[in-house]
């Protein structure tokens, strides 16, 4: 009896081993793949029996030899017996292409993804945002995705109006994981055309990913519905407001409570000339708040425009830097009447513009300009303005001079030079993406650390990260370190993390590329060398959010936390831009030691802002009078020539004349007035009172 029981147990073990091996038949080197196999409804796939496979073969013969889904998944499948390949689950107008074309054949193949034993992973992935897409497709292998795009773009009008790279950015697997087709195809396969081609390496990568998963950071979606956000920064006034720049010409305020004000902080969309095509850099470029913004309310904006007075001469548009002042009455809005033009540079092309504005710890304004793709022949026709292209300018905006908007710092390398403009601090840049100032540099020998991304635009391998140093020529300067190109997207410069919540990132320079890849650079305190580190962003487990779209820029709030700005489309009119925040899942979203008191935004209270009504205040508080005004705080109007016969100048070149006189300067006698001798002092008092009332009405 005991021997019989042992024999039955042995048979049971052999049977279990057989079924397990049968289940894994056709799934090459998956190791723990059985745990990952799930159908779209969450159930495990079924092992097809012989009669199911026989029925599939008969259906294949009836269809004229066309391969059905049963032929793709002969062992494990989520479609049983005579279930049709589409199963009614992929009802979409793109699948109406049923004629005998190559596109129709690919669509029939894609329908079979629902029968895949990995269908849940193919359709439900944190990389995707299905709700925002017109196409419901599985994650495609890269080569297969491009094959589908080029084959079907002429047969599916309205759905493939984009480039192959952009289409496959959303519908192709980027991390080398599971993708469709996950069965052998009779074709010459490239390195990423078929999931089975990379299965051997995938398990190794996944095992490494599982080991380091606990070190990943998360991304938290903060705001959506933005239009091409290109920057986010704080004003340093203690209000902890985040100012979000939109390429079309708007600046919006995000409150510490996570709300966006309905009225924009700055609206110059009528002045800004923005590009709507991919690669067109025109638009609102940058914003920088004065270090003493809380008292003087000064901010500096760079944007592209095209004014009539520049119509003569070779140019496509103008890059302009303007100073604005916040409204005296509303701290959440800019007074557009306070605009003062600082700088204008004529541009011939719509790329390599730069335009980043920064204030360094030295209090000077830095303007980073690209080379504008200008050639030597172009420079001869640019009337000298091209001397600034490809340079970092350093200006002192804290000047009391009313006739010029800035002065030149005496420490500029070309302060006394006749060969270079004195504004130039460094030169030789090509296409500076984004630059950032480290607010707490660790090197005691360097009091200013500016890190910039730059590229000459010819190929991805030319991308570099530069540390800007006074007087240096960066024409052929190598990058801080040689890093492997992780995609064909251009680099997007970020920020040196000096926040509190993600303390593991402290001191790291966080940046990425347009295609959504992230990296960090860290400087060794001993060797002073920069070291590259990938930035791991988790997409599951302790992380609830995930990143999607193209990286447009990075941002930093008043607490030093770093943000990511993205958009899924390149059109400025679409509201699909998002703002993400990098957070450490190992720590609370707002640790107690990271909290800071929020100070309500206040209106300007300086003496100049209160009393200077007929002019503008410099950043240092001096009241500069507008034409026609003079005196303390510009209260006295000027009339040239001066008013005569006791007239009073009440407005520029406007005299208030005494009774009996008229003309611009009260020089004429009014002969229409009847001259009646007044015999009493009462009549004189009445005349003087009437004159004073008229004068008071003008002054008020």
Swiss-Prot record:
Q: Where does Zn(2+) bind?
A: 383
Function according to Swiss-Prot or TrEMBL:
Modulates hedgehog signaling in several cell types including brain and lung through direct interaction with members of the hedgehog family.
Please state the protein's primary subcellular location. membrane
Matching entries from Gene3D superfamilies are given as: Laminin, TolB, C-terminal domain
| GO cellular component entries | cell surface; ciliary membrane; cytoplasm; extracellular region; plasma membrane
> What biological process terms from GO does the record include?
dorsal/ventral pattern formation; epithelial tube branching involved in lung morphogenesis; negative regulation of signal transduction; negative regulation of smoothened signaling pathway; neuroblast proliferation; regulation of fibroblast growth factor receptor signaling pathway; signal transduction; skeletal system morphogenesis
* Consequence of substituting residue 383 to A/R: Abolishes SHH binding
Designated name of the protein:
Hedgehog-interacting protein
**What's written under domain?**
A flexible loop interacts with the SHH zinc binding site and contributes to zinc binding.
Q: Which residues are glycosylated?
A: 99, 416, 447, 459
Keywords annotated in UniProt: Cell membrane, Cytoplasm, Disulfide bond, EGF-like domain, Glycoprotein, Membrane, Metal-binding, Repeat, Secreted, Signal, Zinc
Organism, by scientific name, is Homo sapiens
**Outcome of altering residue 382 to A?**
Abolishes SHH binding
Give a brief account of the tissues where this protein occurs.
Widely expressed in fetal and adult tissues. Highest expression in adult heart, liver and pancreas, and in fetal kidney.
């Amino acid at each position: 009896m005991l021997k019989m029981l042992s024999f039955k147990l042995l048979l049971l073990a052999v049977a279990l081993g057989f079924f397990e091996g049968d289940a894994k038949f056709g799934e090459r080197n998956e190791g723990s793949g059985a745990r990952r196999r799930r159908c779209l409804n969450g159930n495990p796939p079924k092992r097809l029996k012989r009669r199911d496979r026989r029925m599939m073969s008969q259906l294949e013969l009836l269809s004229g030899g066309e391969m059905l889904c049963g032929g793709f998944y002969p062992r494990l499948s989520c479609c049983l017996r005579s279930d049709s390949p589409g199963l009614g689950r992929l009802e979409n107008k793109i699948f109406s292409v049923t004629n005998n074309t190559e596109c129709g054949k690919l669509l029939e193949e894609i329908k079979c993804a629902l029968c895949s034993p990995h269908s849940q992973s193919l359709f439900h992935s944190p990389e995707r945002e299905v709700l925002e897409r017109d196409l419901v497709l599985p994650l495609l292998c890269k080569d297969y995705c491009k094959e589908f795009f080029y084959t079907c773009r002429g047969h599916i009008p309205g759905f493939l109006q984009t480039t192959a790279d952009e289409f496959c950015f959303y519908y192709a697997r980027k991390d080398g994981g599971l993708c469709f087709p996950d069965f052998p195809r009779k074709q010459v396969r490239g390195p990423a055309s078929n999931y089975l081609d990379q299965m051997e390496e995938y398990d190794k990568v996944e095992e490494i990913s599982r080991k380091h998963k606990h070190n990943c950071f998360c991304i938290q979606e903060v705001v959506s519905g933005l239009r091409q956000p290109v920057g986010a920064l704080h004003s340093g006034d203690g209000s902890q407001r985040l100012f979000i720049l939109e390429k079309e010409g708007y600046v919006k305020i995000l409150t510490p409570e996570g709300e966006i004000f309905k009225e924009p902080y700055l609206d110059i969309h009528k002045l800004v000339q923005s590009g709507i095509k991919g690669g067109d850099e025109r638009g609102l470029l940058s914003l920088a708040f004065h270090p003493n913004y809380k008292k003087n309310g000064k901010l500096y904006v760079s944007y592209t425009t095209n004014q009539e007075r520049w119509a003569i001469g070779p140019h496509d548009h103008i890059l302009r830097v303007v100073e604005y002042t916040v409204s005296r009455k509303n701290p959440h809005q800019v007074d557009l009447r306070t605009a003062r033009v600082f700088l204008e540079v004529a541009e011939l092309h719509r790329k390599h513009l730069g335009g980043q504005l920064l204030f360094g710890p030295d209090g000077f304004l830095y303007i980073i300009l690209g080379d504008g793709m200008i050639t030597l022949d172009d420079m001869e026709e640019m009337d000298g303005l091209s001397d600034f292209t490809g340079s970092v300018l350093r200006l002192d905006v804290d000047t009391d001079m009313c006739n010029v908007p800035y002065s030149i710092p005496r420490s500029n390398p070309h302060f006394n030079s006749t060969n270079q403009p004195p504004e130039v601090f460094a030169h030789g840049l090509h296409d500076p993406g984004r630059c950032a100032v480290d607010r707490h540099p660790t090197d005691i020998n360097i009091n200013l650390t500016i890190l910039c991304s730059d590229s000459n635009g010819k190929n991805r391998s030319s991308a570099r990260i530069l540390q800007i140093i006074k007087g240096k020529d960066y024409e052929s300067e190598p990058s801080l370190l040689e890093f492997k190109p992780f995609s064909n997207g251009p680099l997007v410069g970020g920020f040196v993390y000096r926040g509190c919540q993600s303390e593991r990132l402290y001191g790291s320079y966080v940046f990425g590329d347009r295609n959504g890849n992230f990296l960090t650079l860290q400087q060794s305190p001993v060797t002073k060398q920069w070291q590259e580190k990938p930035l791991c962003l988790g997409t599951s487990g302790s992380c609830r959010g995930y990143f999607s779209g193209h990286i447009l820029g990075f941002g930093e709030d008043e607490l030093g936390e770093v943000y990511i700005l993205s958009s899924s489309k390149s059109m400025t009119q679409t509201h699909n831009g998002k703002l993400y925040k990098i957070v450490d899942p190992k720590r609370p979203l707002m640790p107690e030691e990271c909290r800071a008191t929020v100070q309500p935004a206040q209106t300007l209270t300086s003496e100049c802002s209160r009393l200077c009504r007929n002019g503008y205040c410099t950043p240092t508080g001096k009241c500069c009078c507008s034409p026609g005004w003079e005196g303390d705080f510009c209260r006295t109007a000027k009339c040239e020539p001066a008013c005569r016969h006791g007239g009073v100048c009440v407005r520029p070149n406007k005299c208030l004349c005494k009774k009996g006189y008229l003309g611009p300067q009260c020089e004429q006698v009014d002969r229409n007035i009847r001259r009646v001798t007044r015999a009493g002092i009462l009549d004189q008092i009445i005349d003087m009172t009437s004159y004073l009332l008229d004068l008071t009405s003008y002054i008020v």
